[in-house]
Amino acid sequence: MRKSTKRLLVLTSAAVAGMYAYNRLVDSNAARKNLLKVDNGHYYKWKEGNIFYTQNGTGTPLLLVHDTDSRASGEEWSKILKKLSKKNTVYTIDLLGCGRSDKPSIKYTNYMYVQIITAFVNDVIGEACDVVATNLSAAPVLMASALQKDLFNKTILINPVPLQQLNQIPDKASKFKQTVINLPIFGTFIYNKLMSPLKLDLLFRNKYMLRSQLISSKVEDTYYESAHHG
């Protein structure tokens, strides 16, 4: 074996070992604060994985659907859950691939979320409900409503993305990125870097919050844990 080839193998092995060690470190530390509680909820067994949800209050059924970002979860609604529960039976859901729900290595599409939302309303809620959706989750909620018109009574969309953005078809670059992310070790390493605390803090400062003084470390930690939970 040539020295250059042997050196390349050694460097490659060291790099893979380093990425594996980093991934293990992230896995062990991400949920150590245990901010995403599971004892206050239930799991709905869907065909592609278990979906975590909570149910609170009594009254008109209300479904709260968080953003489809993997850092998001039903905890987005924690500040208003108690107030909404006074007159409603409030359901929060962690979409597949987010929060406390399973994170299978599958292709995540808007239509998949449509299927999840439709199945959840039919199987768990059991009747037409009001729904509130944020950002990217607005699209599957509207699609679900269009496909099954008796699914929702009232629909509220918070900061929905522009229709022009929803109309975009995944190109080769986005498909390649998805393929890379799904790779073992290397893909997980890239994902962990993209979902690092530093990246998350920048996201809050540049996109989520107009005033940085409103950003709390607990909220950031919850989003970080959601991205790595399970």
Could you describe each region identified by the protein language model?
Residues 167, 192-230:
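Conserved alpha/beta-hydrolase catalytic His-Asp/Glu region
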Residues 55-100:
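Conserved HGGG/HGGXW glycine-rich cap/lid loop of the alpha/beta-hydrolase fold
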Residues 42-56:
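A short loop-to-beta-strand scaffold at the N-terminal edge of the catalytic core in hydrolase folds
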Residues 167-186:
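A catalytic-pocket lid/entrance helix-loop region that shapes and gates access to the active site
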Residues 74-76, 101-107, 167-169:
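Conserved catalytic-core motifs of eukaryotic protein kinase domains, centered on the activation segment
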Residues 2-26:
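Hydrophobic alpha-helical topogenic segments used for membrane insertion/localization
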Residues 82, 92-132:
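Active-site loop/oxyanion-hole signature of alpha/beta-hydrolase fold enzymes
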Residues 124-170:
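Conserved hydrolase catalytic core segment
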